[in-house]
Amino acid sequence: MTISDYKSAYEDTIEMAREIREKFGIKVSVILGPHPVSWEKQIHTIGLQEYTSLHLKAVKLAINYISTGEAVCLGEVGRPHYPVSLEIWTAANNLLLEIMKLAAEAKISIQIHVEDDGEKTYSDLAKLCDKASLPRHLAIRHYAPANISTDFTHGLSVTVSVGKDSISKIVESLPDCNSYWGMETDFLDDKNRPGAVLGPKTIPKRTNQLNEKLKEAGYSEDEIYEILENIHSNWPQILYS
């Protein structure tokens, strides 16, 4: 694994986005970055210091593409979502802090891949953001649980994995939410795993469900319109630009 490999992967992704824009006439935004699971796997074969150095080079390369407008966000970055040794966990947090500092310096958002340990995960991330001088709203928790209350998220932005029962939980916590949030499917487009994780049609389906749940909860048509416009248009433009 070399920085040239990352450059090739990034440019392949950018080219795919260009082809889709030209063929279908739709807006496609690109997120680039080295995945934290890749870091955890590679350090066992390449070495912790050597691969951490390469990982940071890959982050800086992604930031260069963002600065030229070819990508809109750095990600997924973060830390392993599964148990690791204390040494690796500490190194992963130190690495994430350095990545956040680079993002803060570049004034860009990051999409974060982390473990699901409830409010503690958000608390940890918020402290890292503050230490790195990265505004919390520029740290976007990917594959987030449906509790979007600010007390739970600590002011981080979230994209909720909208599986079954997610909409009820979103509506329940919405009155206590003062942060940016959105919907996601984590769709893989893997021919060997059709539909994984959730298919693209899930978003309009869940949007309709959200509309109905908000009506049942007493929200007015204007309030519902504002919520839907924010999560599907206004806030993505703020976070991914």
Located regions from the model:
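Mid-domain alpha/beta scaffold segments of enzyme catalytic cores
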Residues: 1-106, 112, 122-134, 141-149, ...
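Gly/Ser/Thr-rich loops at beta-strand to alpha-helix junctions
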Residues: 116-119
